[in-house]
From Swiss-Prot:
Catalysed transformations (reactions): L-cysteinyl-[protein] + hexadecanoyl-CoA = S-hexadecanoyl-L-cysteinyl-[protein] + CoA
GO biological process, one term: peptidyl-L-cysteine S-palmitoylation
Species annotation: Danio rerio (Zebrafish)
Location(s) in or outside the cell: Endoplasmic reticulum membrane
Keyword field contains Transcription regulation: no
Annotated PANTHER family: PALMITOYLTRANSFERASE ZDHHC11-RELATED, ZINC FINGER DHHC DOMAIN CONTAINING PROTEIN
Gene assigned in the entry: zdhhc11
Ranges annotated as spanning the membrane: 47-67, 77-97, 177-197, 235-255
Ranges facing Cytoplasmic side: 1-46, 98-176, 256-430
Name listed for the protein in its UniProt record: Palmitoyltransferase ZDHHC11
Length: 430
């Protein structure tokens, strides 16, 4: 099923380039540069901004300001009217101005189609202050806007509410439009609240206009005074006041956020584009917390594990035999190892005491094994002359799975094969 996009660029099917070819091509229509915010395509945010401004102007000067007493109505007309007129002028000016770079406005023909950017020939659209699409030299802070299809001098951002880029030529008109909108909304909210409260507290204060002398009853109100008085009910007046208050509060929050942000940018001497680039390049503190710490060296690991890991004792299942291992890896020792040690020690009629010789391997594990042998009565005088030496530097057997647990049977085999001059046994047959 084919997905249709009404807002995308439509492709037209043309004849093959070669007369002999049978396959047609999909060719996109040429792309032209936009002059200002009134150039097509228009954005939906433009109409939303126009509708909100028109609604607030109508309810302010058609409903609420005429209901004020004579001294206050003149002040409201002057203050709110000045803010609304200033906003309208600056808004329209920011939309109408062409913010393109001076060389673009001098040399570029907006009616000619834009060339296609080839990233195999040029790494960036603007290379060495030369725009490959506009085909002109631009200023250092100029950026090529993909929506307007041209280079903008002192580029700040592309505003959807203006449908135009905000650059060096129209930035202060944009800033004035935002500031005047904030001032106008701040003046409008107290006016709406005053009318809403006085409607219940003292309606006579709002009915001082001469046209109210012909109206009977407090349930009927007049709007669009004094030019075209229209009667309406109290419910309609209150509903419009409630909608106006909510819309004004929402607009005030958004506009104040935008105004404070641009005041901060002006204090830092940067543009919106530069602020976004810095944010992208700065490291994220959350990512720093997720990075695991670097592992210490092997020696430090062995020492820390000696202090932190308690020794595992296999003495519980073996009443007269004990073995102690200090392991590098964490976790309990499996029971088959203790059983294997029991079989190996029982085969040679040996028993371990609490005295042990320690064998250390750099970067690996630390193992404690006893070296005092318990022999029969006839062999004890010979064994008393035996001198037991530590096995410093002897190779040991390591588990092929990467664990630091040592096979006890193989250790006994090394003791039997490598030190026959020290230890001598007679294996008794049953």
């Amino acid at each position: 099923m084919t997905n249709l996009n009404c807002f995308g660029r439509h492709r037209r099917r043309t004849a093959p380039h070669n007369a002999t070819g049978s396959r047609s091509e999909l060719v996109a229509p040429p792309i032209h540069s936009r002059i200002n915010g009134w150039s097509s395509p228009l954005h939906s945010f433009q109409f939303i901004a126009l509708l909100i401004f028109s609604f607030m102007a109508i309810v302010a000067f058609g409903i609420y300001v005429p209901l004020l007493p004579a001294p206050w109505s003149y002040a409201a007309y002057a203050l709110i009217g000045s803010a609304f007129v200033l906003h309208l002028f600056s808004h329209v000016t920011a939309v109408t101005i062409d913010p393109a770079d001076v060389n673009v406005r001098r040399r570029k023909d907006y009616s000619s189609p834009m060339p296609t950017f080839d990233n195999s020939k040029h790494p960036h659209v603007i290379d060495n202050l030369h725009c490959t699409l506009c085909e002109v030299d631009v200023s250092p802070k100029a950026k090529h806007c993909s929506t307007c299809n041209k280079c903008i001098a002192d580029f700040d951002h592309h505003c959807k509410w203006l449908n135009n880029c905000v650059g060096g030529r129209n930035y202060w008109f944009f800033f004035t439009a935002v500031s005047s909108a904030v001032i106008g909304v701040i003046l409008l909210i107290p006016l709406v609240l005053f009318v809403f409260i006085e409607h219940y507290v003292n309606p006579a204060v709002l009915r001082t206009a001469p046209q109210f002398q012909t109206v009977k009853g407090n349930g009927t109100w007049l709007v669009f005074l004094p030019v075209a008085p229209v009667e309406t009910s109290s419910i309609s007046l209150l509903v419009v006041s409630f909608i106006t208050a909510l819309l004004s509060l929402a607009a005030l929050l958004l506009l104040c956020h935008l105004l404070c942000f641009h005041i901060y940018l002006l204090s830092q001497g940067i543009s919106t584009y530069e602020y976004i680039v810095r944010k992208r390049q700065s490291p994220n503190p959350k990512e720093k917390q997720q990075v695991p710490p670097a592992l210490p060296s092997n020696g430090a690991t062995a020492q820390s594990l000696e202090l932190q890991e308690p020794p595992l004792n296999c003495d519980a299942p073996l009443s007269s035999r004990s073995c102690t291992f200090k392991l590098e890896d964490r976790g309990p020792m499996p029971e088959p190892i203790c059983a294997e040690m029991e079989e190996a020690s029982g085969e040679h009629h040996l028993s371990y005491s609490s005295e042990s010789a320690t064998q250390k391997i750099a970067g690996e594990s630390v193992m404690s094994l006893p070296v005092v042998w318990s022999l029969s009565e006839t062999e004890r005088p010979q064994a008393s002359q035996v001198e037991v030496k530590p096995l410093e530097g002897r190779p040991v057997v390591q588990d092929p799975l990467g664990s630091s647990i040592m096979d006890t049977a193989l250790v006994h085999q090394q003791l039997m094969t490598e030190q026959p001059q020290y230890l001598h046994f007679k294996q008794k047959m049953p």
